[in-house]
């Protein structure tokens, strides 16, 4: 059987690429003749033409595995030099309609339909296999499939004439019927079509052509009319459901966009842009892409509405705060200025520009044209608002009697400072006498009870007197002056007495010292100007030299000193 099948040119790689020569056919014919049963009567021989050449690799009907070479020569015994008076077993009689005898009723199949009679159609080449694509990938070969790839077959009859079959036409066109009729005549001459087909009426031939057209379109892979995708039979249901889902989603998205566009407060520009976009959509765009774009625009519009609402909320809150603040200020003042504001607004335009007359002509003052007047031009102006009159008494003398009581010290209590020069001392005494108006000086502080050392006080007496004063001890509260230098015991006792004195000062709280004499306070005084505390003698001696606080240099008079108790 393989040798018989190898006689024709096949597209599959399992077959031989070149047809066998005529001697091989003779050998096969003689083998078949020897095995023929002599009891089977012979029938009228029928001419049969063998294809001598094929221009292109085409899907020939008898390349199918179910067809056998021996079945072609069934009851072909009358041909000289071939199978004479020999029939093949009935199991081999699986014939194509072109080679079937008249007594076999086989449904004719058009030569245009490149399909076998088996259950599975074999793929002839790699290009043919690639033409069947998935339903989810774009089609590569959508049209003009039969224009350039049409097969050219040449057949020869018994007389040696050759016939060429050229371009295939669609089965539904009128020209295809003519080609089929011409092909049938040629096949009838070559013995490839039965007498029943050639002798049939034109009506029968038209019916058979319709059946051929139906068989042609049924055998091809289906094509989706919407997205133009080739589909397999197993993908039809799934692809149809997918298209229906997209069709159902399309009206919903359109309706949602229309509702959003017709919402109250939508700007006219957005409505216009939405209508222009709907009109500008191309009809060839896929429903899935258009639905995606509509959803994207809807999301953008929702974002815009949310941002605008937030902004308006912030502005309204700020305006509300300003209004509440103004209302509070109006309530505090206790007066309503609504009527006055209305009057000002009415007369604002009339008094906006200041007019004056010069040389008999009315002119407008240029400064009133500027917003803000002189202040708008850059000049500094004083406030035009007049302060309300105040009946409060102005204290010019600085009388603090009601607040701090009567003055406790006067100018007579000040201890004057003695100068080194006689002329300067005389001037100080004259100035002091003028201030006191001839009154006697105060005796609050005497040299005997002074904390300041007498050697630091300059004196106008002779040198002997100064030496005697220098020999006197200045620390009246200490017993050190009773100690003599000759006795070490007395020195030790004096130190013990000093320690006990310091302990008593710490026990009674004398831990604060005057910053002038660096000793514990003796009758502390403070100034009502700066509230610094010093000893009485320190204040009076400082004011005798200058009328300033010894700590902060604030102007201080003797009447500003007050006695305090620590």
UniProtKB/Swiss-Prot annotation:
Keywords: Coiled coil, Cytoplasm, Isopeptide bond, Metal-binding, Nucleus, Phosphoprotein, Transferase, Ubl conjugation, Ubl conjugation pathway, Zinc, Zinc-finger. E3 ubiquitin-protein ligase that promotes the ubiquitination and proteasomal degradation of SIN3B. Independently of its E3 ligase activity, acts as a CTNNB1 stabilizer through USP7-mediated deubiquitination of CTNNB1 and promotes Wnt signaling. Plays a critical role in the regulation of nuclear lamina. It catalyses: S-ubiquitinyl-[E2 ubiquitin-conjugating enzyme]-L-cysteine + [acceptor protein]-L-lysine = [E2 ubiquitin-conjugating enzyme]-L-cysteine + N(6)-ubiquitinyl-[acceptor protein]-L-lysine. In the brain, expressed in the hippocampus, telenecephalon and cerebellum. No expression in astro glial cells or in neural progenitor cells. One of its GO terms (biological process) is dorsal/ventral neural tube patterning. It is found in: Cytoplasm; Nucleus. Residues 277-300 are annotated as: Disordered. The keyword Nucleotide-binding does not apply. The gene is Rnf220. Pathway: Protein modification; protein ubiquitination. InterPro entries: E3_ubiq-ligase_RNF220-like, RNF220_mid, RNF220_RING, Znf_RING, Znf_RING/FYVE/PHD. Residues 485-513 form a coiled coil. One of its GO terms (cellular component) is cytoplasm. This is E3 ubiquitin-protein ligase Rnf220. Its EC number is 2.3.2.27.
């Amino acid at each position: 059987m393989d040798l018989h099948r190898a006689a024709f040119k096949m597209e599959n790689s399992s077959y031989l690429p070149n047809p066998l020569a005529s001697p091989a056919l003779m050998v096969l014919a003689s083998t078949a003749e020897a095995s023929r049963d002599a009891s089977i009567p012979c029938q009228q021989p029928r001419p049969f033409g063998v294809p001598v050449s094929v221009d292109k690799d085409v899907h020939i009907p008898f390349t199918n595995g179910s067809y056998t070479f021996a079945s072609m020569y069934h009851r072909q015994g009358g041909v000289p030099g071939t199978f004479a008076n020999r029939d093949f077993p009935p199991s081999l009689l699986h014939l194509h309609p072109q080679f079937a005898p008249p007594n076999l009723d086989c449904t004719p199949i058009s030569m245009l339909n490149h399909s076998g009679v088996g259950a599975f159609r074999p793929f002839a080449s790699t290009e043919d296999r690639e033409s069947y694509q998935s339903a989810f990938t774009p089609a590569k070969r959508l049209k003009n499939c039969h224009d350039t790839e049409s097969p050219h077959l040449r057949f020869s009859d018994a007389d040696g004439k050759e016939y060429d079959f050229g371009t295939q036409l669609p089965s539904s066109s009128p020209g295809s019927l003519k080609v089929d009729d011409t092909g049938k005549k040629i096949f009838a001459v070559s013995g490839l079509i039965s007498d029943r087909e050639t002798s049939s009426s034109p009506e029968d031939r038209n019916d058979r052509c319709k059946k051929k057209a139906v068989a042609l379109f049924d055998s091809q892979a289906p094509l989706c009319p919407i997205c133009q995708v080739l589909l397999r039979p197993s993908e039809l249901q799934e692809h149809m459901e997918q298209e229906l889902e997209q069709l159902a989603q399309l009206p919903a998205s359109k309706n949602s966009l229309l509702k959003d566009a017709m919402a109250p407060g939508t700007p006219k520009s957005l409505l216009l842009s939405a209508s222009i976009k709907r009109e500008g959509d191309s009809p060839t765009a896929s429903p899935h892409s258009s639905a995606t774009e509509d959803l994207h625009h809807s999301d953008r519009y929702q974002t815009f509405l949310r941002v605008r609402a937030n902004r308006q909320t912030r502005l309204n809150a700020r305006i509300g705060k300003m209004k509440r603040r103004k209302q509070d200020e109006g309530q505090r003042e206790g007066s309503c200025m609504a009527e006055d504001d209305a009057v000002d607004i009415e007369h604002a335009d009339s008094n906006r520009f200041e007019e004056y007359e010069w040389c008999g002509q009315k002119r407008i003052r240029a400064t009133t044209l500027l917003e803000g007047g002189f202040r708008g031009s850059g000049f500094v102006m004083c406030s035009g608002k007049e302060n309300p009159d105040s009946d409060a008494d102005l204290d010019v003398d600085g009388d603090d009697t009601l607040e701090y009581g009567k003055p406790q010290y006067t100018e007579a209590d000040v201890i004057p400072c003695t100068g080194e020069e006689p002329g300067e001392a005389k001037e100080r005494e004259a100035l002091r006498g003028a201030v006191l108006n001839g009154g006697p000086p105060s005796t609050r502080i005497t040299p005997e009870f002074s904390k300041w050392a007498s050697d630091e006080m300059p004196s106008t007496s002779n040198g002997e007197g100064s030496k005697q004063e220098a020999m006197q001890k200045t620390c009246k509260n200490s017993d050190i002056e009773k100690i003599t230098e000759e006795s070490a015991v007395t020195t030790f006792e004096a130190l013990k007495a000093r320690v006990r004195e310091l302990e008593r000062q710490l026990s009674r709280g004398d831990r604060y010292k005057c910053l002038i004499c660096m000793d514990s306070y003796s009758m502390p005084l403070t100034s009502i100007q700066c509230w610094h505390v010093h000893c009485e003698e320190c204040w009076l001696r400082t004011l005798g030299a200058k009328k300033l606080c010894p700590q902060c240099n604030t102007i201080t008079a003797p009447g500003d000193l007050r006695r305090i108790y620590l």
